[in-house]
Swiss-Prot record:
Localization annotation: Nucleus membrane; Nucleus, Nuclear pore complex; Cytoplasm
Sites carrying sugar chains: N39, N383, N547, N776, N882, N1412, N1571
TM regions (residue ranges): 1776-1796
GO biological process: mRNA transport; nuclear pore organization; protein import into nucleus
Protein role: Component of the nuclear pore complex.
Organism annotation: Drosophila melanogaster (Fruit fly)
Entry protein name: Nuclear pore membrane glycoprotein 210
Paired cysteines (S-S): none
Length: 1876
């Protein structure tokens, strides 16, 4: 017992101990950090009052957590305070205040030794919540630290490969919708740091490595943790199981589950892999069967490493089988009976032997046949297994299917579309009414054999004819469906009726039927009044309630309605055919039996509740027209008539009804007014007045209107037709006498009965063109004329008056008849009365404000088209009538088989006697019943027909008849038309009398016209519409079928009677199509619009812009001005000879969009390029704006910068030629890779308005080509080629045989002679070249072309740096092909690809494409253009176009700029090219040019106007760059002296003149040069042979002087003029002796080759002579100057010193013919300066300088010392000068022999040594003699030396950017100073 008690006590104690308070962690491990204190919270599980303490305050500190103001805490924060990096332990005590119980926790501090990551999974799924990863730390013993709160860690996601996308990303807890932010890392996320917990989210499938490291310096040794995490996707393969045939393919779809929905994945991340490639193989997602069998297809992820075996991807089962059976079915109902409008799919399926359906791809196809008129195919699969379509036409058709030897057939039956009416029905439910309701459902379509089904037969039954009968009895039956409504009420019953085809019951239509009890009755609509014997339709609506709203019954014919009438004037009749109004279910059809008023009450009782409604009804007499009885009015303009109506609705005084009367008519034609009168009768009258011509209906309507919704309009109306017409015929009625032979009755005889008052009443009737009598003619003016016997008509000779008789009807006036009343004393024989309707009564019309037509009663002449007033007249003969029987007296009839003319006889009695002047020409027949005269031609000729009226006493009528045929045919039409369009051709027929044939348009076949088209495939001709054609014209329509030219003619007749028109040549052209189709421009840019198609030649093409504020067009260049969109419209106009007007024969339009340039981008073909390679860099606009557009912008600044100039450099394509584009033209540049490295190219663009676009950059990497350095490699020939190219191998030896290596993979093929063909495959191959004892391996690599590069062929250079291309330049470019590394491909290929080009403006640049991938540009015009060069076949070429900016301007170094010259012109060409370039002329017989100097002379002219001579400078023969000048040479047909009158002094005279064409009115010199002085220096003597000079005189004295002068023609280079030179052959004294003091006049004439000449008059005034010609000063003694000449000239001579400070000239004396002057020298005369004496003679117009030559070797003090005789004195005096001259000559000879011994010998100019030359002439001639006589040599027999030295001054005038050519010469002397 004690043991038991002890046991119980121990258990109690144990339980108490177990329930005592405890700390949450009795042992805690915390980490140590240098600059971080780690916190950890200890907590007692019972919230009592505890005091906290620590055993080691140096290791840790304890901070209690107090709640409110209490000093008790059951929680405390332990903080690590030590930084000692070793393991220590401290104890935390928690003492309970009340009990003293102490709790302890051991806190261990230590350093972190390792890390580890804890997570629930190492796999993430796309589109799922991010996963949390938590880091844990451990000490050296593997114990885990309790907390890492507040410690920062480095988390890094590393991808296994750089090419794979990032698999996952960090996600903060704040951004995650699935997580809350943990308190321990809340501060870290705010600071953007990462702690010990993190979220990772998968964004792409793949595997990534997550590395976690500690950034603290004290823990750098801790090894980072690496965790591999895979990101997967929820993916399935569709189809999962499929059977295909061998060779066929099936496409698998990869579907990913995202947000519970499947999405198709179409990126390249996933790929499929087949398990057994012998059964099937894959290409992308398409599997192709290879052999019969079964295998699996697995899904692989490219982002997943090959070693990842985390998860086997989804798979599909693929079976390859052979077809065993073919089936056919009609989906979706699997029934071959259908109706129109149904959509079906005809399924043709193959099945394997095991019954598996075979899925077909595109390899095989099933043939099918179906009549698409029955079943319209909308779509079909490529393999033919599914035909999607719609049933279209009723009928039966067969559907066939076949596959190889398998076939199948089915019969498709299509019926009319199935329809059911009505589709929604609401019916009454009344348990007291057992009468079933019958409701007819109407079905249509199908085969009319329907199956009807009731949704609930207990409620409604339906028979086989669609008639439904309600059978509802007890709504509580279990078979009755009662539905609960929204308002809590119950639907009595609901069921459906369905109709279906009997043969295919899946094709059906459904109607819904609802049964409800009635709630309200209402008469919804009723016409409360009606006419007698007409009906009142009372529409009764009964309403039920559903969902708190009323719903009308569809039908309630089974309900019994009670009708109660107050007066029995209506009776109920059957309502068959009456359609109920809206919301009415029953119609009461009541017939009116009596006139009166009644009240009707309609009621119905339901469940002791009476539902009723009341309405008042009225009956009246029907509305009718009283007058006119025929209910039709015919009036002329301005006349009126009254119309009377009776009965109809009347005003009611018992209901609030308003009677409404209205009329409807055309107010332009009629004016209507209502007549107001007081009458007891129910009469209404209106007056209608015709305002203008036309027909209209006058409708009178009257009804009563009630302001209630149930009111139904019952309108009474009567319509009267009113004709407002022109008068056309006048009829006069009286009693007449007839012939005895007349078969007419005697009552219409012409017997006049005289009354007692001698009055004659003639009834007047005016009819319109339809012979309708006008009811009132008061607005017409009638003129009356009278004649007795044979007298002419006279007006107003007999008293007469015109009256209108009226009648009255119910007080309304109505017209009766119009009469002409005459008063005659007697009636003469043949008394005639003629009435004429000539005009309107303008006064009456003015009263009504009516303006009648002008001319009055005008009709149109069908022949002339003019409007004229017809003759409206008639006459009465009291004893004889002279009526016109025929409308004309002449007519022509066309002779043709079965052709006849029919003439109506409108006048006369109708009984005629016919007589022909000649028989056999025409046959005449007359039908008295129809009164038609029929003329049938028999042969060509002329005959006269006489017609006599058998009743009337009138003269016979005569008709002249000509029977004609077709004499000529003329065709008028346009000669050009667009393909598929039509033009009209007018064929004019002329008869045999050369008159236009009157063509009967209704009998065109009688003319036997036929057309003959030379080529019927080009155009077709058919007969056109024959409206609005002229006399003798037939319209045809010509349709263009295809492009081409052909001839067409029209002909008629056969044999000798055949007549044909002249052939008409017609061109059918293609439609004009503008290009480019749709363009996008920026403001300021331009583009050229061009067109294809149109007629040839197209001389009238007009291109315009719709919105000129957006863009404008000049010529064909469109320039953008404003943002927006506009259209460019091109029209081709041709004159239509038919209409005589210009017509648009073809047009097209394109859209131009003007957008803002927001930015640019740099496009380069490569971003990695090897050193030394060159590639283009081009600016493109955003988005995708071509350089072709940007290159046309004006005033745009583009700057290019390179971050590393040592890595790459930028230059433009013209740099090698000396053209450096400035910023405005750098749209495209070249990039050359220099050294390995990385560089950034930046392009900045500033627009014309100052807008700076964002800079565009591109990063380039330049790498070094991999080469073998050690050991030294043997260099082997290797070829880099493009696919589909041909190369010819050639070695240095003969008899070499080429073949492929035995291990060749077939990439290329080679012939034994070395012709290599590359194929489409890429890769490397090896060719072996073998001889008898050697072999050479030749490697060849076939690579795709990455880009093309256009390079200027460096053949020409410019002298000076240019920033634009000089106009006239011709460049040659080559196009190189490069691979993806920048290597140039071998393209010694014959027609590798061919080039094509695009130009911004095609008119400014001439492009010539060569066969060797080169092209030439001819820049003859200034332009701001861009050319794009590309390959014609760019297959496989990624960057197949290169762009070059062409900025061409007129260069200052280019001369001449004009192009028209005439014979005799000397042209000094100037070129910006270097002096080494050569000049050439295309025809040296016309223009000869020195090939070195560029000086040309025009020798002759071309006979053809406009033919050009080409002058080139450069290297044209080697296809290099060159300049070209196009010269147009014209005949010199005008010669003109500079002066017409002049004076000359006698010894010599030169008359300057100019030779030119008559159009060159502004030409004054024949030397055309930019630098005349320079050109003159280089120009030698010029032979002149195209004009001659003659001297003549009119008086005897002048004729005596002619023999003393020599006259010749010459060219003076110094002044650039041609001259006629006179040279005196005798002495001057002899000339003076003859002339003496007389005035002598001579005439100088210059004559060109064709005799055109000009003359000038010369007055001979002998000049003065000065002696000595120079004064040599040896001392200061005076000198005498003698001047001889005529006395009259000497008296006016002026002699002046050049400087009066140092010497003076004094007059001494004047004798006969001689004047003397003294020269006085002053002592201070400087002898080292130049002085002269100036002699001026005004009469002879001479100015002579006499130089004073001083001796500087002698000092002034020695002037009196003499050394012997004069000779010795002279020698000693000039000894210094002689010695100096000798030394200079010797040195010059030595230099010449040393440096210029290879040069030609300079010709001596002997003109310099002739006597009688003035100083000025000597200087000029000496200057000319020092020049190269190159031009003279050019035209003389002497040979021209090409190495002739130019003068130094000329060389110095040039500047070169490539160095002086002579300085660069190899034989130049090092010490030469010629160019210094």
């Amino acid at each position: 017992m004690d043991s038991i008690l002890c046991m119980i006590l121990l258990i109690l104690v144990r339980n108490h101990a177990s329930e005592a308070a405890r700390l949450n962690h009795p042992r805690v491990l915390l980490p140590i950090f240098e600059d971080k204190a780690i916190n950890f919270t200890l907590e007692v599980d019972e919230p009592n009052c505890y005091k906290w303490s620590s055993s080691r305050q140096d290791l840790i500190s304890v901070m209690p957590i107090y709640k409110g103001f209490s000093e008790c805490a059951y929680q405390a924060v332990v903080t690590v305070r030590t930084h000692d990096r070793r393991r220590n332990t401290a104890i935390v005590f928690a003492e309970e205040v009340q009990t003293g119980e102490t709790l302890r926790s051991d806190v261990i501090v230590d350093v972190i030794a390792s890390l580890n990551v804890r997570t629930a999974t190492r796999q993430l799924y796309l589109e799922e919540a991010p996963a949390m990863f938590e880091l844990h730390a451990f000490d050296e013993q593997g114990n885990e630290f309790f907390t890492l709160e507040g410690i920062e860690f480095d988390w890094e996601i590393l991808e296994p490969g750089s090419k794979r996308p990032t698999a996952m990303r960090y996600l903060t807890f704040t951004d995650s919708p699935y997580h809350t932010v943990p308190p321990t890392i809340e501060k870290f996320e705010a600071d953007g740091k990462k702690g010990h917990m993190i979220l990772l989210e998968g964004i792409n499938t793949g595997t990534a490595k997550v590395t976690i490291a500690m950034p603290q310096a004290e823990y750098k040794h801790v090894r980072p943790v690496e965790v591999y995490i895979s990101v997967l996707a929820n993916i399935i393969i569709e189809p999962s199981e499929v059977t295909i045939m061998a060779g066929d393919s099936v496409s698998f779809r990869i579907l990913q589950l995202k947000m519970d929905r499947l999405h198709v994945i179409d990126n390249n991340q996933y790929y499929l892999e087949v398990e057994d490639s012998s059964i099937a193989y894959l290409r992308g997602n398409s599997a192709t069967g290879a052999a019969l069998g079964r295998t699996q297809v697995f899904l692989r992820d490219r982002n997943m490493a090959d070693s990842d075996e985390v998860q086997k991807g989804p798979s599909a089962l693929l079976t390859v089988a052979y077809p065993n059976r073919l089936s056919i079915s009609l989906l979706p109902h699997l029934n071959w009976v259908t109706v129109q409008g149904e959509h079906h799919a005809i399924a043709l399926d193959l099945f394997a032997a095991d019954g598996q359906k075979i899925t077909m791809g595109t390899k095989y196809s099933i043939n099918s046949e179906v009549d698409e008129s029955f079943f319209a195919i909308v779509d079909r699969t490529r393999n033919g297994s599914r035909l999607f379509g719609q049933a279209k036409k009723e009928g039966i058709t067969q559907v066939y299917g076949s596959y190889k030897d398998l076939s199948v057939q089915a019969e498709l039956q299509i019926f009319e579309e199935l329809q059911l009416a009505p589709t929604k029905v609401v019916l009454p439910y009344d348990p007291n009414s057992l009468k079933p309701l019958k409701l007819q459902f109407h079905a249509s379509g199908g085969d009319n054999n329907y199956a009807w089904f009731s949704g609930n037969p207990q409620v409604i039954q339906i028979d086989t004819q669609g008639q439904a009968t309600t059978e509802i009895r007890d709504v509580k039956s279990a078979y009755v469906n009662q539905e609960v409504l929204k308002d809590g009420g119950k639907l009595t019953a609901h069921t459906t009726v369905k109709v279906a085809l009997s043969k295919n019951q899946k094709i059906s239509r459904v109607a819904h039927i609802y049964f409800l009890p009635p709630e309200r009755l209402q008469i919804t609509r009723s016409n409360f009044e009606t006419a007698l014997k007409d009906f009142v339709h009372v529409h009764v609506g009964v309403y039920a309630r559903i969902n708190n709203s009323e719903v009308p019954y569809t039908s309630c014919d089974n309900l019994h309605f009670q009708l109660d009438f107050s007066q029995p004037i209506l009776q109920l009749e059957g309502n068959e055919g009456a359609e109920a109004a809206h919301e009415a279910c029953h119609v009461l059809r009541l017939r009116a039996t009596a006139v009166g008023t009644t009240s009707l009450r309609v009621s119905y009782m339901y469940m002791d509740k009476v539902l009723y409604d009341i309405i008042d009804l009225y009956v009246f007499e029907p509305l009718v027209v009283l007058n006119p009885i025929e209910n039709e009015v015919v009036l002329p303009v301005g006349s009126s008539r009254n119309i009377i109506y009776a009965n109809g609705p009347q005003r009611s005084f018992t209901v609030a009804a308003e009677i409404i009367q209205s009329t409807a008519f055309d107010e332009k034609i009629l004016k209507v007014s209502k007549l107001e009168f007081d009458t007891q009768n129910l009469i209404t009258a209106f007056t209608v007045l015709c305002r203008e011509l036309g027909e209209t209906q006058f409708t009178y309507r009257v009804h009563n209107s009630l302001p209630t919704s149930s009111f139904a309009l019952y309108q009474s109306e009567v319509t009267t037709k009113v004709h407002c017409v022109r008068p056309r015929f006048l009829k006069l009625y009286a009693r007449h006498n007839l012939r005895d032979s007349c078969p007419l009755e005697k009552r219409t005889s012409l017997l006049f009965l005289k009354d007692p008052e001698n009055k004659i009443e003639i009834e007047i009737e005016v009819h319109d063109s339809n012979n309708r009598r006008l009811m009132n003619i008061s607005s017409l003016g009638l003129d009356w004329e009278f004649s007795a016997g044979e007298e002419r008509y006279q007006k107003n000779i007999i008293p007469h008056r015109q009256i209108s008789e009226l009648e009255f009807n119910h007080g309304v006036t109505l017209p009766s008849r119009d009469l002409l009343v005459l008063t005659l004393s007697e009636v003469a024989t043949n008394f005639r009365i003629k009435g004429t309707v000539s005009q309107y009564n303008d006064k009456l019309l003015a009263q009504h404000g009516i303006h009648a037509e002008r001319p009055p009663f005008g009709i149109k002449n069908p022949q002339t088209g003019l409007i004229y007033t017809p003759l409206i007249e008639n006459e009465i003969r009291l004893h004889a009538v002279n009526s016109t029987l025929l409308p004309k007296d002449y007519m022509s009839i066309f002779l043709a088989s079965g052709y006849s003319e029919r003439i109506p006889i409108a006048q006369g009695s109708g009984y005629l006697q016919l007589e022909l002047s000649e028989a056999g020409i025409v046959q005449v027949e007359y039908n008295e019943n129809t009164r038609i005269l029929v003329l049938t031609p028999l042969r060509l000729g002329h005959v006269r027909l006489e017609l006599t009226d058998r009743c009337l006493m009138n003269e016979p009528s005569h008709l002249s008849i000509s029977v004609v045929g077709i004499g000529a045919i003329e065709v008028v039409s346009m000669d050009r038309l667009e393909r598929t369009t039509r033009i009209e051709a007018i064929v004019r027929l002329f008869d045999t009398n050369d008159n236009l044939l009157l063509v009967d348009q209704s009998k065109l076949s009688a003319y036997d016209l036929s057309e003959v088209v030379a080529d019927q495939s080009i155009l077709s001709v058919r007969l056109g519409e024959q409206e609005n054609v002229g006399p003798g014209e037939i319209r045809y329509t010509i349709t263009g079928n295809q492009v081409g030219e052909t001839k067409i003619l029209f002909q008629s007749g056969k044999g000798i009677y055949k007549v044909a028109s002249d052939p008409l040549n017609i061109q059918v052209f293609a439609p004009i199509r503008l290009f480019p189709r749709d363009s996008t421009l920026v403001v300021g840019s331009s583009i050229q619009v061009y067109f294809h198609g149109g007629p040839h030649p197209n001389t009238n093409m007009i291109i315009s812009v719709e919105k000129e504020q957006v863009a404008t067009i000049s010529s064909t260049v469109v320039t953008a001005h404003k943002l927006g969109t506009t259209k460019i419209v091109g029209k081709c106009l041709l004159k239509n000879p038919v209409t005589g007007k210009d017509e648009v024969v073809s047009q097209d339009s394109v859209e131009v969009h003007v957008v803002a340039l927001k930015g640019v981008q740099i496009r380069t073909p490569l971003v990695r390029i090897h050193s030394g390679a060159v590639m283009p860099a081009t600016l493109w606009g955003l988005s995708d704006l071509s350089p072709m557009i940007l290159g046309t912008l004006q005033n745009t600044k583009i700057s290019w910068k390179v971050s590393q100039p040592q890595v790459v450099e930028i230059f433009n394509v013209f740099t090698t030629a000396g053209i450096e584009y400035q910023s405005g033209d750098l749209i495209s540049v070249r990039v050359r890779a220099l050294n390995p490295g990385k560089a950034t190219i930046t392009a900045s663009v500033t627009l014309a308005d100052g807008t700076i676009l964002p800079p565009a950059t591109v990063d380039l990497q330049v790498f070094k080509t991999l080469e073998l350095v050690t050991p030294n490699a043997i260099k082997m020939d290797s070829i880099l080629a493009a696919p589909r190219s041909i190369l010819q191998l050639k070695s240095n030896m003969d008899n070499v045989v080429y073949k492929l290596d035995d291990r060749s993979n077939g990439i290329v093929s080679v012939t034994p002679d070395g012709l290599v063909h590359t194929k489409d495959s890429l890769g490397r191959d090896l060719i072996i070249a073998t001889t008898a004892d050697q072999s050479l391996p030749i490697g060849i690599e076939v690579k795709n072309v990455q880009y093309i590069l256009v390079t200027l062929m460096p053949i020409l250079k410019l002298r000076e740096l240019e920033h634009k291309i000089p106009r006239g330049m011709n460049f040659v470019f080559k196009v190189s092909l490069h691979d993806n590394l920048g290597n140039e491909l071998s393209h010694n290929i014959e027609d590798f690809n061919g080039l094509r080009y695009e130009l911004g403006n095609k008119d400014d640049v001439d492009v010539q494409i060569d066969n060797n991938l080169t092209f030439a540009l001819n820049l003859m015009r200034e332009t701001n253009n861009v050319i794009g060069i590309s390959l014609k076949d760019s297959t496989g070429v990624k960057h197949s176009m290169d762009f070059i900016k062409l900025s061409v301007v007129e260069s200052d170094n280019l001369f001449p700029t004009k192009t028209i010259f005439s014979v005799g012109d000397i042209i000094c060409f100037d070129s910006p090219l270097t002096l080494s370039s050569t000049w050439r002329s295309s025809n040296e017989q016309i223009v000869y040019i020195n090939k070195h100097t560029g000086i040309a002379q025009v020798l002759s002219h071309r006979l053809k106007p406009g033919e050009k001579i080409e002058i080139t400078n450069g290297d044209e023969t080697k296809r290099g760059g060159f300049l070209k000048y196009d010269l147009e040479v014209r005949e010199s047909d005008t010669i003109l002296f500079v002066k017409s009158v002049d004076t000359f002094s006698g010894p010599e005279y030169r008359g300057q003149l100019v030779i030119r064409n008559h159009l060159q009115s502004e030409k004054y010199s024949n030397l055309i040069a930019q630098n005349v002085s320079k050109c003159a220096r280089e120009l030698g003597s010029v032979p002149v042979n195209f004009f001659t000079c003659r001297l003549a005189a009119k008086d005897a004295l002048g004729r005596n002087l002619l023999k003393m002068y020599k006259v010749d023609a010459l060219f003076e280079p110094s002044i650039g003029q041609y001259s006629c030179r006179l040279q005196l052959l005798t002495g001057f004294i002899e000339l003076l002796s003859i002339v003496k003091t007389h005035d002598v006049y001579l005439e100088l004439e210059a004559v060109v080759a064709k005799g055109v000449s000009d003359k000038m008059s010369l007055k001979l005034v002998p000049g003065i002579k000065v002696f000595p010609e120079s004064v040599r000063v040896t001392d200061l003694k005076p000198h005498e100057i003698h001047i001889s000449g005529l006395d009259k000239a000497l008296l006016k001579v002026q002699v002046k010193p050049s400087d009066s400070k140092y010497f003076a000239v004094d007059f001494i004396e004047h004798g006969h013919g001689l004047s003397k002057y003294r020269l006085e020298l002053f002592d201070d005369l400087p002898l080292d300066e130049n002085f002269y004496i100036l002699v001026v003679s005004p009469d002879t117009k001479q100015s002579i300088e006499v130089p004073i030559i001083g001796n500087t070797m002698l000092a002034p003090k020695c002037t009196d010392r003499r050394y012997g005789g004069p000779l010795v004195y002279r020698i000693l005096e000039n000894l210094g000068f002689v010695l100096t001259t000798t030394v200079i000559v010797i040195i010059s000879i030595w230099v010449y022999m040393s440096c210029f011994q290879t040069q030609g010998v300079t010709q001596v100019n002997f003109e310099a040594f002739k006597k009688g030359k003035s100083r000025t002439e000597l200087m000029q001639q000496s200057g000319r003699s020092s020049q190269d006589d190159t031009f003279g040599d050019s035209f003389n027999v002497r040979n021209f030396s090409p190495d002739r030295r130019r003068p130094p001054s000329n060389a110095l005038s040039e500047s070169y950017i490539y160095g002086h050519p002579r300085l660069n010469s190899s034989n130049r002397s090092e010490n030469s100073t010629s160019f210094s």
